[in-house]
Amino acid sequence: MAHILMKQLLEAGVHFGHQTKRWCPKMKEYIFSERNGIHIIDLQKTLVKLEEAYEFAKEQAKEGKTFLFVGTKKQAQQTIEEEAKRCGAFYVNQRWLGGMLTNFTTIKSRIDYMIKLEELKNNGYFDKLPKKQANRLNRELEKLIKVFDGLRGIERIPDVLYIVDPKREEIAVKEANKLGIPIIAIVDTNCDPELITYPIPGNDDAIRSIKLITSKIADAILEGRDLREKEADLQLKDEDLQSEIS
């Protein structure tokens, strides 16, 4: 993993947890101390867990697995979109619809419908309709884009989820756990880390904290995909060499 300094974590405020009265006792092992009614996260443990999550994401990407980034809280929306696009992951940053994983066939049909409506609009079909009908379809398309824009091109249930604030995204967590999909997540002091396959203890409210950790997971995916491409190139060269010899 690209080296992360303790200073970076401190500057990003990764160590600031929630109020002590809002804590989840299962986070006890990741808490360093209490300050002014706020739990302070043990950043040494954050580094260890981030390293584990990084290696897992890298290996999954190397195997060609697909990723879905989830973070619908205001502080996470921009980072989730930017980092998912940067590493070629799908994303949900506006609203998690119940059944996005457990009722994927229906969700996929809505995504296909959104794309079909876009094609009709771009081809000028809406312009030929009565104004009232065209306005209705435009509103419907806007709503679909808001929810499904980050899922364009998805063909099957994703292999790995990355989540900012699993407490807020509890429906996504439940669906992933039901289907046995591994989860990487930033877990603040009010979260249950036992629900997460690769928990990363950290502040899930500060934009800089979210950005720092999310960017590292995106880096891991990019590194894994780069390794996959290099291995594929080597295999092709070996096959070419074997054919020349024979």
From Swiss-Prot:
Entry-linked InterPro entries: Ribosomal_uS2, Ribosomal_uS2_bac/mit/plastid, Ribosomal_uS2_CS, Ribosomal_uS2_flav_dom_sf
Gene Ontology annotations for the cellular component aspect, listed alphabetically: cytosolic small ribosomal subunit
Protein's name in the database: Small ribosomal subunit protein uS2
Native source species: Dictyoglomus turgidum (strain DSM 6724 / Z-1310)
Molecular function per GO: structural constituent of ribosome
Cystine bridges: none
Entry's family note: Belongs to the universal ribosomal protein uS2 family.
One Gene Ontology biological process: translation
Keywords: Ribonucleoprotein, Ribosomal protein
